[in-house]
């Protein structure tokens, strides 16, 4: 795996009682898994000391779009209530598929946390190593968290439209190829098929192996094979802003500069009849 932003289960087990470490459970149901009660899954068993980082609950509920970043002050209050301290080393994990931990990693970094790592292999890897789980909620004292939002981390639909029209940035779409190529319907109702004109398709699952990123050589080969240049600004997108963070994490691991996330993603673009799509029908 690529280790820049990752820690292993053995390392975390050794440091689990370190007061400068905080563990964050960021597992999340993907589209089509609406019947899952992820909060209950957390209560049924999580890494000892981990608080539950509910990406759905921590999104902007004033927006009709899913998983949009909340206001900085809203996020800061939520983190303080969870007991999260922004000056500690935060270790984020998901169920072990690397589906949602990168989104939590990106949110925390975008709101000013400097030390954030992802547990390679996630909860599944922890359990494979026969390490113990804890049941029930984790109650911590109020944390110290003052969100310092980085506006350079995210772009809006107008920025993406300009990049698509003027070719000023590469747009990478992390959705599966069948959705990108308009061969199947979107899992969310009411969205058109297709992709943003000029976008390149790098499905997030191709970057991942057993809950970790592939090696840097493998990542380079995948990006180069899809026509991505590291010398040009990059905008990452997906269905709702979650798996785009996997692509962003991979590019960060490769030290690629000037990468931003389109938070509205296809949930916004695909819902608007006034925006262009490819392939044309």
Swiss-Prot record:
Protein name per its UniProtKB record: 3-mercaptopyruvate sulfurtransferase
CDD domains hit by this protein: TST_Repeat_1, TST_Repeat_2
NCBIfam families registered for this protein in UniProt: PRK11493.1 (NF008557)
EC class: transferase
Active site: 238 (cysteine persulfide intermediate)
Function: Catalyzes the transfer of sulfur from 3-mercaptopyruvate to a thiol-containing acceptor to form an intramolecular disulfide releasing hydrogen sulfide and pyruvate.
Residues where substrate binds: 179
UniProt subcellular location: Cytoplasm
Gene3D superfamilies from the UniProt entry: Rhodanese-like domain
Gene Ontology cellular component terms for the protein in this record: cytosol
Keywords carried by this UniProt record: Cytoplasm, Repeat, Transferase
Region annotation (Substrate specificity) ranges: 238-244
Enzyme Commission code: 2.8.1.2
PROSITE patterns: RHODANESE_1 (PS00380), RHODANESE_2 (PS00683), RHODANESE_3 (PS50206)
UniProt domain Rhodanese: residue ranges: 17-135, 165-278
Organism field: Escherichia coli O157:H7
Gene Ontology MF terms in the entry: 3-mercaptopyruvate sulfurtransferase activity; thiosulfate-cyanide sulfurtransferase activity
